[in-house]
Regions:
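Conserved beta-loop-beta/alpha segment of the NTase-like Rossmann-fold superfamily
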Residues: 67-129, 143
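N-terminal glycine-rich phosphate-binding loop and ensuing alpha1 helix
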Residues: 1-43
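Residues at the starts of beta-strands that form the adenosine-phosphate
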Residues: 32-34, 112, 178
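A recurrent flexible, glycine/aromatic-enriched loop bordering the glycosyltransferase active site
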Residues: 132-142
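Acidic helix N-cap motif at the loop->helix transition within catalytic regions
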Residues: 44-49
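Residue-level signal for inorganic ion chemistry
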Residues: 9, 18, 75, 88-89, ...
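Conserved donor nucleotide-binding strand/loop of the catalytic core
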Residues: 54-66
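Conserved alpha/beta core of the MobA/IspD/sugar-nucleotide pyrophosphorylase nucleotidyltransferase superfamily
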Residues: 140-209
Length: 209
């Protein structure tokens, strides 16, 4: 991102990206418990930001790990009752309430749900001799929140870590459980570059008009 500030703390429309994300999830899942995984070294910074911005959305903070798997594992230690769990990237503040609710409802009924969108650009696969075109209709872009019944997710995270675990769905799928797909929203971008941040600012401005 070209900044020493962790990307989730970067300013978006006068407050940190992470606050937008938490507020959106809180609005979508009223009365739900929010658990935030952060590196321990960022605890004090987050506390200070919450004070500066008078951030009032109730949430717990747990220590994140080196990998996503470790961070989610630590957060799951706070789950002590049967429920549906939504795991969302802190730098995806533009998720639509309808997508969150759709994921949660599908997970409630079928145990799993993740949002996906179609690929609109051409794809090529690397080969030893160069590359070959692939059928983009056979691939999807995966987003978050990824939602699961607590029974399914807690059992999945009892597995040993594998480098093949790129997201929560891959952890659950490793147990042989089918992942249900729902339609995501295209503007639910993961803010990882300066260009992403500019796009998010445009979307935020349009949403506030």
């Amino acid at each position: 991102m070209g900044s020493t500030i962790p990307k989730q703390f970067l300013d978006l429309n006068s407050k940190p990206i992470l606050m937008h994300t938490i507020e959106k999830m809180h609005q979508s899942l009223d009365h739900s418990e929010i658990i935030l995984a952060l590196p321990k070294s960022e605890f004090d910074t987050w506390k200070k930001l919450c004070q500066e911005h008078q951030f009032k959305v109730n949430h717990q903070v747990v220590e994140g790990g080196v990998t996503r798997f470790e961070s989610v594992s630590n957060a799951l230690k706070k789950v002590n009752e049967q429920s549906v769990i939504a795991i969302h990237d802190g730098v995806r503040p533009l998720i639509k309430t309808s997508v969150v609710n759709g994921c949660m409802q599908t997970a409630l009924e079928k145990g799993t749900a993740i949002p996906v969108i179609a690929i609109e650009e051409s794809l090529r696969q690397k080969t030893d001799s160069g590359s070959v075109v692939v059928n983009r209709e056979e691939y999807l872009i995966v987003q978050t929140p990824q939602c699961f019944s607590s029974e399914v997710l807690l059992k999945a995270y009892q597995q040993d870590y594998s480098p093949t675990f790129t997201d929560d769905a891959s952890v659950v799928e490793a147990m042989g459980i089918e992942i249900q797909l729902i339609q995501g929203n295209k503007d639910n971008i993961k803010i990882t570059t300066p260009e992403d941040l500019k796009k998010a600012q445009v979307y935020i401005n349009l949403m506030s008009e």
